[in-house]
């Protein structure tokens, strides 16, 4: 492990801060990020490099849950014509750099391993720190902790974010999206940037610093209005949740119900 510790979020600086209005309440908005199974439909282009259906989910007491969503594995949903390691590497590198696609996968390395090495070198150049002691999963995977009631923390190197969902009326929410990067080892930490505010109809790609993830966040939240309308018009009074893939969504509501029951006696 790195001596800096990936869990040391206080050793990060805020590089980008987005506040996006969403057309769904804070619970529905948070649910969009509690599971990885939606990749197949919501991020269909990602199925060749994302282990969605085989993501790992863990629950720690009433207030904390986690998923580990691997990058560089092809989805189990793809049963035929699965890409080679070279093809996976091309996709990963093409997303990160304009000139990356087409580079030969180094001998003896998987696409994940080679891509993680590239990310470590890229971040070393940008932030003048050595990240070579980090594991592949610490470097590139989507490792997400949810802290009840409304906060998410990603302690990885490539994917280092914080989410917060706040009520904004009955059927609206404010989504704080913060991209974190390593603090300088020497010298003062730069001041946090002003928040970039987006309306419901605005794309995340309007905000500088979101890079290729801006379009991904558009996909994550573009269906929230339809969900809200569906909740209000459905004859069914509750959600039908998967036993495992949506365990964290159930966990959120079970914990919330405990607090409401205590308050109401």
Q: What residue spans do the PLM features occupy?
A:
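Short amphipathic
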Residues: 13-23
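Single conserved hydrophobic/aromatic residue that forms the stacking wall/gate
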Residues: 1-6, 10
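Glycine-enriched catalytic-core subsegment of oxygenase/oxidase enzymes
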Residues: 30, 34, 40-265
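Acidic/His-leaning functional-site neighborhoods
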Residues: 11, 38
């Amino acid at each position: 492990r790195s001596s800096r510790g990936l869990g040391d979020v206080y050793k990060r600086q805020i590089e980008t801060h987005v506040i996006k209005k969403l057309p769904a309440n804070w619970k529905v908005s948070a649910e969009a990020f509690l599971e990885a199974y939606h990749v197949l439909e919501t991020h269909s282009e990602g199925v060749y490099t994302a282990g969605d259906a085989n993501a790992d989910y863990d629950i720690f007491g009433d207030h904390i849950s986690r998923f580990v969503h691997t990058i560089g594995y092809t989805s189990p949903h793809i049963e035929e014509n699965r890409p080679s390691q070279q093809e996976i590497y091309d996709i990963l590198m093409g997303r990160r750099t304009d000139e990356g696609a087409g580079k030969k996968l180094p001998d003896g390395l998987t696409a994940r391993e080679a891509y993680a090495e590239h990310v470590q070198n890229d971040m070393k150049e940008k932030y003048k720190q050595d990240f070579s002691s980090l594991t592949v999963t610490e470097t590139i995977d989507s490792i997400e902790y949810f802290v009840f009631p409304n906060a998410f923390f990603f302690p990885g190197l490539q994917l280092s974010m914080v989410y917060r969902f706040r009520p904004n009326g009955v059927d609206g929410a404010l989504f704080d999206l913060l991209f974190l990067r390593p603090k300088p080892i020497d010298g003062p930490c730069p001041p946090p940037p002003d928040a970039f505010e987006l309306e419901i109809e605005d794309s995340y790609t309007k905000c500088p610093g979101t890079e290729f993830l801006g379009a991904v966040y558009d996909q994550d939240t573009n269906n929230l209005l339809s969900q809200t309308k569906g909740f209000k018009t459905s004859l069914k009074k509750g959600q039908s949740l998967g036993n495992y893939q949506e365990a964290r969504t159930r966990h959120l509501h079970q914990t919330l119900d405990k607090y409401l029951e205590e308050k109401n006696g």
